[in-house]
């Protein structure tokens, strides 16, 4: 269902692929940005990008569960971090690597940005995932 591609002509990515290919007819879920808020809408990990990344990945897992998918079926992500410091970006990426997102490995882009949508928010991940055929119907 998912074919992960790494081009031998390019620098080998450490924990992601250059592209993900899915066959026509596969159900695809386009997920809204996962943010570091708890179920009551309160910010988790204020001032701590690593803690926020952990919450974002946990919330992403819930989003995927709601569409009958999981981290292993993620095709592509964009990881946004409010920082221009590569050490901070690397620390957030380590959380991504430690999660099931690195199982694929999926294609990904890591970006340092000026700000995100919620006050105090430092991390956000958007994702596209395949939805396995054998999964239950998607909840609405």
Please tell me what each predicted stretch does:
Residues 1-140:
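Short, polar/acidic, helix-capping and beta-turn segments at strand->helix junctions
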